[in-house]
A protein has these predicted regions:
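Ordered, amphipathic secondary-structure segments that act as subunit-interaction surfaces
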Residues: 80-94, 98
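Helix-start/capping segments and mature chain N-termini
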Residues: 1-76, 93-252
Length: 252
């Protein structure tokens, strides 16, 4: 059971009812946000709430609470947990707002470089974090079955968009690139775009062009920057974390 704050009241919810993409998930229509805490402090909470409310407008989902009220609820659930570093989930579904936390356990080996694969899939409303997570979950399971950290979603033309749980950046000739549109406006992604000491350009990368990139990394709110050293079984660069990626890791 998960101890959750539902419409500002505590209740216990079966864990399987909160697992996005699972057949047991209880809320097919809705939105979600996930962010982390660092020493009991929420990281980038404001942009996460901004994105939640913007998505609610786009999907015409009514959220009964203000951002300030949600912020206060989040403070309550964070303080209730003994873990200083937590993963916080917001579920906004018809007539309900559900907040809960879980312990954030990161494997530091990922920062030495991970392997990813490409998975072709049809993507619907990628710019919105909806609770209809089945497409991304299926892609992620393909990666997991291949003993890879992440699945990079591509279309029928072999164009890369983003990961099932992340955004993607690549580096060619010391220039930093990412997709401009048709991807989730990730919070960590936007932080890199806004604050990186390296200028970011928007571009398109095809599966056939992966062998030509020098470096690659993923971003998400839980893990931050994750270097990619192998793509579809092939090395990126020399197969180790690249110079620019290393500098960004230190800055982040």
């Amino acid at each position: 059971m998960v101890n959750a704050l539902t419409n500002n009241k505590w209740e216990s919810i079966p864990k399987e009812n909160l697992q996005l993409g699972a057949e047991t998930f209880a809320y097919e229509t809705g939105l979600y946000e996930t962010f982390r805490t660092l020493n009991h402090h929420p990281v980038f909470l404001e942009p996460h709430l901004d994105r939640l409310f913007n998505s609610a407008k786009l999907t015409q989902l009514k959220i009964e609470y203000t951002q300030q009220e949600i912020w206060e609820m989040i403070q309550e659930i964070i303080e209730k947990s003994p873990n200083p570093n937590q993963r916080v989930r917001i579920l906004a579904v018809p007539k309900k707002l559900i907040l809960y936390t879980s312990s954030l356990e990161l494997n530091n080996l990922i920062y030495k470089g991970v392997s990813v694969i490409t998975v072709q899939t049809n993507r619907v409303h990628p710019e919105i974090k909806t609770t209809d997570y089945r497409t991304c979950l299926t892609a992620w399971k393909s990666a997991n079955d291949s003993r890879c950290f992440e699945a990079i979603l591509i279309d029928k033309n072999g164009i890369l968009f983003e990961g099932s749980r992340s955004n993607i950046f690549w580096i060619i000739n010391k220039k930093l690139f990412t997709r401009k549109k048709d991807v989730l406006p990730g919070i960590t992604r936007q932080t890199i775009i806004n604050r990186s000491s390296f200028p970011v350009e928007f571009g398109i990368l095809k599966k056939s062009g992966i062998s030509k990139i020098d470096e690659c990394f993923l971003t998400n709110s839980g893990s931050g920057i994750i270097p990619v050293t192998h793509f579809n079984g092939e090395k990126i660069g020399n197969g180790s974390v690249g110079e620019i990626t290393n500098q960004l890791l230190k800055q982040y």
